[in-house]
């Protein structure tokens, strides 16, 4: 504690140290005075000066070029990563009603109780998982915010978060913000798109605080099994880390019934599951989800959250209850995207791709071609993607994180099944003409 009788000397000492730090690196004359103040975690003095262009910005630029060069050619967009339909009418009508209720005007903080109770009902009905609505559930403003906050509960400088790659990087980004490190677990086809924990060394296990999983996996489409989750639980207990399972795509499971991590014995002792209403309920922009599982971890998340946001708008939470209580909504969405994936797989197989309907998610992840017959060769998936976009007006997302693969999304806009069929026919026409080499 700082002695109250010496505030001036303490302040001067801190200020002088701060000034020395701020002026230790010169800034350019054209820079604003605060260029030297940016935190190292976002680039420090070099913030905003990088010429690096990230993947999705490259895709946006390539799309603009394709539209400019071929204005009369239809752009086939398989790159969109969000649902193409609005939320169910029942949910939208509930939002309109709830927005007019005075009790929804204020801060929701870590409530309200009725949303948590609806989540408890949903988890019991869908997964046979019993949760205490008061202690084992809390809402989040979309799963992204939850994944950004959970590292604050556990990560100190030098700690490790294990993450699957390819995957959603948010928890890893925030791990680094707190001075931690990310250990990448490649998801390779030869391992069935599961991490190979046998390759993790003892020194990594010693420093690991969190393991972040994502099943059904985006973008590979693999789904978890009970045996896999059992292995994870045993490792968590042996090496003493917590498990965060990102279940954003869990309702888009196509092979068997959706499997929650919390259904597996022991899961509740070691971790939490993060759910989202975006994918499975067509509520992408509504930003509503929840964290559930171990009560102590949920409490830690709630404490961090309480210092980061004031809760999602009550009308959104109470409208979401209508979706949670209607099992027909995710069933209809799942049926639609499975149908589209089956059509896409059929189309791509006609063009040389070796692919199958994934276990889950609305993404199809498949090996990128190495080139076209008698023509170009591609060094990686990004080169293939840029070629498809700029030369053939087909937007496909590249993934070079663990092998060279392409990710097709079936969230394209199509008014009906006839429109879906027409789009698939055009896809086959364009790709077959290229004579792709694999």
Model regions and ranges:
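Conserved core segment of the aminotransferase class I/II
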Residues: 22-24, 33-38, 42, 118, ...
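Conserved glycine-rich beta-strand-loop-beta hairpin in the small C-terminal domain of fold type I
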Residues: 321, 337-345, 355-371, 400-404
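Helix C-cap/helix->beta junction micro-motif
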Residues: 66, 70, 178, 238-239, ...
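N-terminal small-domain helix-loop-helix segment of the aminotransferase-like
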Residues: 27-141, 149, 323-325, 343, ...
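Conserved core of the PLP fold type I
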Residues: 100-234, 251-252, 258-264, 272
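PLP-dependent enzyme catalytic core of the Aspartate aminotransferase-like
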Residues: 17-26, 121, 129, 377, ...
């Amino acid at each position: 504690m700082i002695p109250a009788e010496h505030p001036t000397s303490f302040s001067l000492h801190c200020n002088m140290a701060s000034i020395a730090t701020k002026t230790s690196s010169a800034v350019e004359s054209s820079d604003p005075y605060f260029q030297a103040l940016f935190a190292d975690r976002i680039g420090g003095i070099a913030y905003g000066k990088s010429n690096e262009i990230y993947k999705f910005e490259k895709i946006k630029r390539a799309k603009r070029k394709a539209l400019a060069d071929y204005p009369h050619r239809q752009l086939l967009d398989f790159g969109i990563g969000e649902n193409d339909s609005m939320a169910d009418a029942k949910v939208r009508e509930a939002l309109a009603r709830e927005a007019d209720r005075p009790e929804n005007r204020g801060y929701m903080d870590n409530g309200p109780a009725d949303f948590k109770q609806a989540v408890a009902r949903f988890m019991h009905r869908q997964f046979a998982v019993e949760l205490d609505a008061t202690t084992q559930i809390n809402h989040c403003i979309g799963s992204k915010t939850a994944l950004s906050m959970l590292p604050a509960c556990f990560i100190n400088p030098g700690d490790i978060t294990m993450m699957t790659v390819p995957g959603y990087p948010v928890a890893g980004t925030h791990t680094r913000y707190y001075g931690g490190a990310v250990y990448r677990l490649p998801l390779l086809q030869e391992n069935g798109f599961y991490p190979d924990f046998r390759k993790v060394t003892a020194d990594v296990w010693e420093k690991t605080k969190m393991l972040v999983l994502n099943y059904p996996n985006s973008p590979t489409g693999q789904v978890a099994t009970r045996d896999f989750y059992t292995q994870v639980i045993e490792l968590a207990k042996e090496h003493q880390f917590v498990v965060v399972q990102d279940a954003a795509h869990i309702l888009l499971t196509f092979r068997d019934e959706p499997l929650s991590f919390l259904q597996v014995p022991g899961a509740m002792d070691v971790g939490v599951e993060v759910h989202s209403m975006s994918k499975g309920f067509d509520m992408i922009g509504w930003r509503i989800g929840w964290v559930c599982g171990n009560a102590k971890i949920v409490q830690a998340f709630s404490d961090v959250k309480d210092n980061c946001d004031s809760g999602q708008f009550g009308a959104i939470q109470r409208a979401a209850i209508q979706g949670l209580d209607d099992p027909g909504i995710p069933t209809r969405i799942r049926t639609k995207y499975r149908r589209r994936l089956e059509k896409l797989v059929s189309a791509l197989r006609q063009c040389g791709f070796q692919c199958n309907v994934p276990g889950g998610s609305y993404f199809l992840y498949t090996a990128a071609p190495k080139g076209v017959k008698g023509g170009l060769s591609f060094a990686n998936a990004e080169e293939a993607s840029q070629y498809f976009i700029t030369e053939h007006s087909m937007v496909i997302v590249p993934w070079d994180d663990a092998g060279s693969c392409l990710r097709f999304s079936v969230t394209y806009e199509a008014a009906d099944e006839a429109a879906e069929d027409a789009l698939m026919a055009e896809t086959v026409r364009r790709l077959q003409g290229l004579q792709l080499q694999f």
